[in-house]
């Protein structure tokens, strides 16, 4: 099986990568079948041989995750939605919904408490007013 992968080169701690097509059983920095591009993560420079990449992809070459990301950014393949991304978005949506329900519940409880307090204050005030208006019989 042919893989599209990154082949490391450069100084220590200053790596650059060549995008290569190679046999899936060969070493990371082994001899490639074909060099298809270049990627420098420090400067974000990317050069891709679009025609050769399309040819290799049509032949059934499988890109690694890092190469797939580069190809998506380069516009050579469509962005794929991975199952983990879908699950993550669903979890975030469920959490937001639960937080909204909790906030609405707390707001309703606070409103009910405020209404009960206002009602108690009004009853106490009317009771005080009724006691003051009644004539004192002695």
UniProtKB/Swiss-Prot annotation:
The keyword Transmembrane helix does not apply. This is Small ribosomal subunit protein bS16. InterPro entries: Ribosomal_bS16 (IPR000307), Ribosomal_bS16_CS (IPR020592), Ribosomal_bS16_dom_sf (IPR023803). Belongs to the bacterial ribosomal protein bS16 family. One of its GO terms (cellular component) is small ribosomal subunit. It comes from the Bacteria. HAMAP family: Ribosomal_bS16. PANTHER family: 30S RIBOSOMAL PROTEIN S16, SMALL RIBOSOMAL SUBUNIT PROTEIN BS16M. GO terms for molecular function: structural constituent of ribosome. Residues 94-122 have a biased composition (Basic and acidic residues). The lineage of its organism: Bacteria, Bacillati, Cyanobacteriota, Cyanophyceae, Synechococcales. Residues 92-138 are annotated as: Disordered. One of its GO terms (biological process) is translation. Keywords: Ribonucleoprotein, Ribosomal protein.
């Amino acid at each position: 099986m042919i893989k599209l992968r990154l082949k490391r080169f450069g100084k220590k701690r200053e790596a650059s990568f060549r995008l290569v097509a190679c046999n899936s059983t060969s070493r990371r920095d082994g001899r490639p079948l074909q060099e298809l591009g270049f990627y420098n993560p420090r400067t974000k420079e990317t050069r891709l041989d679009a025609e050769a990449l399309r040819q290799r992809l049509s032949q059934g070459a499988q890109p690694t995750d890092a190469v797939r990301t580069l190809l998506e950014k380069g516009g050579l393949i469509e962005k794929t939605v991975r199952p983990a991304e879908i699950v993550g978005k669903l979890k975030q949506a469920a959490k937001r919904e639960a937080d909204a329900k909790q906030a609405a519940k707390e707001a309703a409880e606070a409103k009910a408490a405020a209404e009960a307090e206002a009602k108690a204050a009004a009853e106490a005030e009317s009771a005080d007013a009724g006691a003051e208006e009644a004539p004192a019989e002695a």
